[in-house]
Amino acid sequence: MRQLFNKLKWTGAKAYFSYVSRGAAGGEEVASIDDVVEVGSGGVTISTGSGERYIPYHRIVEVRLATGEVLLDRRKR
């Protein structure tokens, strides 16, 4: 997962990812790869309107390119 996020971030790919968020309607939120400020060993840190938020990799359920191509879908397990 870390390699995927690094590749997307540093190649400038337009992509989005969905992650489990307990406070969100429907239980998930979506963020852009452009929002990622750090790719770590256990997760990513994103910039939000209210600061930064750490998202562990185990909470990420989907990664999708802006074209619609799905790169990762953990919902299908």
UniProtKB/Swiss-Prot annotation:
The signal peptide stretch is none
HAMAP family (UniProt xref): UPF0248
Q: Which family does it belong to?
A: Belongs to the UPF0248 family.
UniProt-listed InterPro entries: MJ1316, UPF0248
Q: Could you list the residue ranges that cross the membrane?
A: none
This protein is called UPF0248 protein Pcal_0252
What superkingdom heads the lineage? Archaea
